[in-house]
Amino acid sequence: MHIFGIVLTLAVTVMHVYVFFRAGTLPVVKRTVPPQVIITAGVGLWLVFVAGRTFGHGESGFFARSLELCGMTWMAVVFLLFMLIFAADLLTGFGFILPRANAILRGTAVAAGLVLSVVGLYQGMRQPVIRQYEVSVPGLAANLDGKTVVAVSDLHIESAFRKKWLAGVVRRIRSLNPDMVVLIGDIVEGHSPPDREIQNVLNRIEAPLGVWGVFGNHEFYGGLPGKPDLFEASGIRFLRNRWT
């Protein structure tokens, strides 16, 4: 595990303990949930995160990628809960200044964090929103006037279990009848190369003036700029230190 992974695991562990300790001491939780259940849930979910980082990160296969997805999803939930509970504690002096308000605010923070987590999951699974802009370019050649360029960013695709979602994105791109398509970074998550099923879906993106791309930071995480053929097999031509 790299330094970043170690620091991330330690940070999430601290947030994890804080969230379960502060949520577990809420009056309503203390009355209705046995301590053993809280401890078991806390340890179990922490192990899911650690297993996702240790055994799922950078590995191929449905099980490994599913494990990492579960771990990273739980990390996001913990982060939201931590920020909201910590804010409630700061506002009330951790219960020493405003003890009654602290319990109310902490309970509200937990509820808000869970609701935001559900909203975030929904937003992450829905199709991207299409925004249309008319761009005026001084000196543009007459034969290029009125052309449609579709720009797509931050798809963060990686595994075959998101193939249906990606296929929906490709259908939306094709429905716009683009003259050119540009993929502007973070096309994949970068933990492992895109598999054949993903390449086949990307290959359905077509445009008369070509499908072009640039690398984002997530491509560099997996060393993919050194393997452009993995993308070019899908008909994507990458620009790196050059223009066209």
Regions found by a protein language model. Give the residues of each.
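Non-catalytic terminal accessory segments
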Residues: 1-126
